[in-house]
Amino acid sequence: GLFIRMDFVPVQMTIDGTQVSITSGYTDTSFSTDEILDLQLLDSLPDDSFVRSNGSADGHQLLGVFRGKKTGPCRMYVELDESPVLSIQTDEYTVFLTAPTKIQAENWYQELKDHMFDN
């Protein structure tokens, strides 16, 4: 677990007003909290076959733009050995996101949830 690839930048999520930004060293995504249709904290990625259209999948992490057979278009920021997985469904795509710690993931979930119901 001590081996860290130099290219891995921890994913960050920030919420500024209604604007949610997810940044990583590879690709960034932003959307408005108004666009969130569904928000879940999952134990792992859904059982689906995901095809990469623009991104990186090295067996440890999925990063970038993917399409799931059932899920449809998605944005992945997932370390495969991290749990839980935050699933944020917008009208355009679903974002899957893991955090470095379980607590961080739960905080992000709570923060998004609070913003969703502010509107």
Identify the residue ranges that each predicted region occupies.
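Context-gated lysine
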Residues: R5, K69-K70, K102, K113
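Non-transmembrane, membrane-adjacent beta-strand/coil modules in membrane-associated proteins
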Residues: T23-S30, D38-D91
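Conserved beta-hairpin
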Residues: L2-T33, Q40
